[in-house]
């Protein structure tokens, strides 16, 4: 009985540490800058135009 309590306590501690580490990783992640999508605007626009053109052609 004592061994089962000890294993349960270790399991609870491991889960608590893993949960707190995952929460800390999401909290410490830096926010993307407002200009981070500026480099993606031209390729996205080009892909959209190509998709529309191929839709009209085919």
Swiss-Prot record:
InterPro entries: AGP3/12/13/14/21. It comes from the Eukaryota. Keywords: Cell membrane, Glycoprotein, GPI-anchor, Hydroxylation, Lipoprotein, Membrane, Proteoglycan, Signal. This is Arabinogalactan protein 21. Residues 37-58 form a propeptide. Contains 4-hydroxyproline; hydroxylated on Pro-30, Pro-32 and Pro-34. Glycans are attached at residues 30, 32, 34. The modification 4-hydroxyproline is found at residues 30, 32, 34. Its main location: membrane. It comes from Arabidopsis thaliana (Mouse-ear cress). It is found in: Cell membrane. Residues 1-24 form the signal peptide. Disulfide bonds: none annotated.
